[in-house]
């Protein structure tokens, strides 16, 4: 982080695995209690987040895809764990939810999250969600309070590069539920399974699609 901070004046962002997701993927042979395990991970993540902020991170994101696998447990523990992980952190606080890498889960995905609206009660500033591949029902975004939403508008299950107009259409759909200052267009998830050419092309389409919508919004003022 210090290396990066020393070489750019732009905002920096770094991601960390979320405490809930880590807890649900490990075998507990010590605590014998799910809540204690989750909160222990949250405490460890908090120490890392504080160090990253001190080193210059502007945005810190927790990846919490596993809240979808046990929504009942997520309702009991996830918000408190996320807030504990960010306790004392002044940087922009974000969390990412998805249904799995598109390359790994290329087929039909749910069109709704079993755990999402609950994050309105968290201390998060931003919520990142996969929406393009699963064709998410975006009405749920209205329930996220004043959070900024990083809306997935790039389908990463295919290397095919979207047109700028396709991306613009997905952004417009998000704007039907959110004010422009609360929507950040983004890829659905990580792009590590794409070729460099495909990833670059998709990111360019993202920029071009956002520019189209930005121009439309400016024309209405």
Residue ranges and their predicted role:
Residues 1-221:
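Domain-level signal for soluble alpha/beta catalytic cores
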